[in-house]
UniProtKB/Swiss-Prot annotation:
Disulfide bonds: none annotated. It catalyses: 5-[(5-phospho-1-deoxy-D-ribulos-1-ylimino)methylamino]-1-(5-phospho-beta-D-ribosyl)imidazole-4-carboxamide + L-glutamine = D-erythro-1-(imidazol-4-yl)glycerol 3-phosphate + 5-amino-1-(5-phospho-beta-D-ribosyl)imidazole-4-carboxamide + L-glutamate + H(+). GO terms for biological process: L-histidine biosynthetic process. Its main location: cytoplasm. The active site is at residues 11, 130. GO terms for molecular function: imidazoleglycerol-phosphate synthase activity; lyase activity. The gene is hisF. IGPS catalyzes the conversion of PRFAR and glutamine to IGP, AICAR and glutamate. The HisF subunit catalyzes the cyclization activity that produces IGP and AICAR from PRFAR using the ammonia provided by the HisH subunit. Keywords: Amino-acid biosynthesis, Cytoplasm, Histidine biosynthesis, Lyase. It is found in: Cytoplasm. This is Imidazole glycerol phosphate synthase subunit HisF. It comes from Aeromonas hydrophila subsp. hydrophila (strain ATCC 7966 / DSM 30187 / BCRC 13018 / CCUG 14551 / JCM 1027 / KCTC 2358 / NCIMB 9240 / NCTC 8049). Its EC number is 4.3.2.10.
Length: 257
């Protein structure tokens, strides 16, 4: 059985790590390199960095900190933010990232997923999906440009359809960001994760809503996700990673020490 992954998520804006609630009202959490070093030493399995305004600002992720992070940690890390071309991805991978994640640019040009997968291998290509439950329609919809409230828009894609399309085009991993739950610390959206799991044949990472150790366990055992991503509970020290991993092990979850 493959070990489940615990993945701190670091949203980057203006050169520092920030965290909002439902993608709004961001507050500063700390320095990029300092937090990366801390999480690596605490036993995180992987890190994900989102330059949250890169796509909405129409620029690519700032690479200066990517190489600094690569120098100080020895765990895999993934970088996202405005990656629109094979060349953008090549530079980020050359600076030391292990994976690139694409979100809004993949929605604008789905062929980007295939081009990246063919050039670097599917194991390097993550597709991030910002999914929002629209209570009026009863559908899970995919949102775009979520780093900037003024530019955020609902796409024509239903979440499950986009998950299937992204896989067909070569996504090696899916990160499902559940916008309704983001920063609320009420638990992952297990119902949506189960629906996505049923159509997702590549590794699936849950994101949005972790607030207690039980939430991680439930995502792993009830929705069968491969990794659980969280931000505020780690940044604010509410759940220490070593403690979380020890507890998950006692709950029967296959976890790396």
């Amino acid at each position: 059985m493959l070990s489940k992954r615990i993945i701190p998520c670091l949203d980057v804006k203006d050169g520092v790590v920030v965290k909002g609630v439902q993608f709004r009202n961001h507050e500063v959490m700390g320095g990029i390199v300092e937090l990366a070093r801390r999480y690596a030493s605490e036993g995180a399995d992987e890190l994900v960095f989102y330059d949250i305004t890169a796509s909405s600002d129409e620029r690519v992720v700032d690479k200066s900190w990517v190489s600094r992070v690569a120098e100080v940690i020895d765990i895999p890390f993934c970088v996202a933010g405005g990656i629109k071309s094979v060349e953008d991805a090549r530079q980020i991978l050359e600076f030391g990232a292990d994976k690139v994640s694409i979100n809004s640019p993949a929605l604008a040009d789905p062929t980007l997923i295939t081009r990246l997968a063919e050039r670097f291998g599917v194991q390097c290509v993550v597709v991030g999906i910002d999914s929002y439950f629209d209570a009026q329609s009863g559908h899970y919809q995919v949102k775009q440009f979520t780093g900037d409230e003024s530019r955020t828009r609902t796409t024509a894609w239903h979440t499950l359809d986009w998950v299937e399309e992204a896989q067909k085009r070569g996504a090696g991993e899916i990160v499902l960001n559940v916008m309704n739950q983001d920063g609320m610390r009420q638990g992952y959206d297990l119902e949506q994760l189960k629906l996505v799991r049923a159509v997702c044949k590549v590794p699936l990472i849950a994101s949005g809503g972790a607030g207690a150790m039980e939430h991680f366990r439930d995502a792993f055992t009830l929705a069968d996700v491969d990794g659980a991503l969280a931000a505020s509970v780690f940044h604010k020290g509410l759940i220490p990673i070593p403690e979380l991993k020890r507890w998950l092990k006692t709950e029967g979850v296959a976890i790396r020490e």
